[in-house]
């Protein structure tokens, strides 16, 4: 699903994650998260 972020008002904060094992931060990795509620 494509989200047009320009239509969502408010403050936005970027977050970066890093890990010594790329498998942990790949899609479906244990350190990945998806926020679906604003």
Swiss-Prot record:
PROSITE patterns: LIPOCALIN. It comes from the Eukaryota. The keyword Secreted applies. InterPro entries: Calycin, Lipocalin_CS. GO terms for biological process: sensory perception of smell. Keywords: Olfaction, Secreted, Sensory transduction, Transport. The keyword Secreted applies. Nasal mucosa. Its main location: secreted. One of its GO terms (cellular component) is extracellular region. It is found in: Secreted, Extracellular space. This soluble protein may play a specific role in odor discrimination and perception. Belongs to the calycin superfamily. Lipocalin family. This is Odorant-binding protein 2. It comes from Hystrix cristata. The lineage of its organism: Eukaryota, Metazoa, Chordata, Craniata, Vertebrata.
């Amino acid at each position: 699903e494509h989200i047009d972020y320009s239509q969502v008002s408010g403050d936005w904060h970027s977050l970066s994650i890093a890990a010594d094992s790329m498998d942990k931060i790949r899609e479906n990795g244990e350190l990945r998260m998806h926020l679906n509620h604003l």
